[in-house]
């Protein structure tokens, strides 16, 4: 059911009808509701499954044990690739951003990103004035803007824009104004923005 929900949410968004998910999963809609009483419960299950998949994918990148810049590039490209093909994850995480298990997974992923960024900065291969939160925002910006283009017949654009964004991390870049102090501050800002969008009906 989670896989079916992921596919349907990716195609239709979280407004997709439960009967459509049940049909794809090969079960009755009552079975879906017995396992997931609300659509938010189903969205949480989708978010958790996809974030766990992210965690495994990042572990694979780290296991290659290449130089720090190549590791960061591999992580950047892997996450942008995955997110650009996966409309369901971003929307699901938006809906269940305060779920404890989702938050725990996000923090684990943030720790992985922070370690890769520290290694690259220590090696002098990326700029010193960025934080892990900057990387997260950059990847999200690239990935979330691309699914409509993917469906419009340009499925590989994510790589072009991911690499353009990655090149902005070079150590000779222009000085930057202050950004988020840490990932917790970033998540708070994103949650506030989500609530404002909901109130405005966006």
Language model features by range: what are they?
Residues 20, 70-78, 134-138, 156, ...:
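Amphipathic alpha-helical interaction segments
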């Amino acid at each position: 059911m989670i896989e079916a929900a992921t596919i349907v949410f990716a195609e239709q968004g979280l407004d997709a009808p439960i009967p459509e998910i049940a049909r794809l999963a090969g079960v009755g809609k009552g079975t879906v509701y017995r396992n997931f009483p609300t659509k938010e419960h189903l969205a949480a299950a989708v978010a958790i499954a996809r974030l766990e998949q992210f965690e495994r994918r990042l572990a694979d990148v780290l296991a290659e044990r290449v130089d720090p810049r190549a590791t960061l590039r591999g992580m950047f490209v892997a996450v942008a690739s995955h997110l650009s093909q996966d409309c369901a994850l971003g929307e699901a995480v938006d809906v269940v951003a305060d779920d404890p298990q989702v938050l725990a997974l996000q923090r684990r992923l943030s720790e992985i990103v922070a370690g890769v960024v520290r290694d690259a900065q220590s090696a002098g291969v990326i700029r010193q004035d960025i934080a892990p939160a900057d990387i997260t925002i950059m990847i999200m910006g690239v990935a979330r803007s691309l699914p409509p283009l993917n469906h419009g017949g340009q499925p590989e654009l994510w790589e072009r824009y991911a690499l353009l964004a990655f090149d902005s991390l070079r150590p000779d870049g222009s000085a930057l104004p202050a950004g988020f102090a840490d990932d917790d501050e970033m998540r708070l800002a994103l949650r506030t923005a989500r609530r404002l969008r909901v109130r405005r009906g966006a």
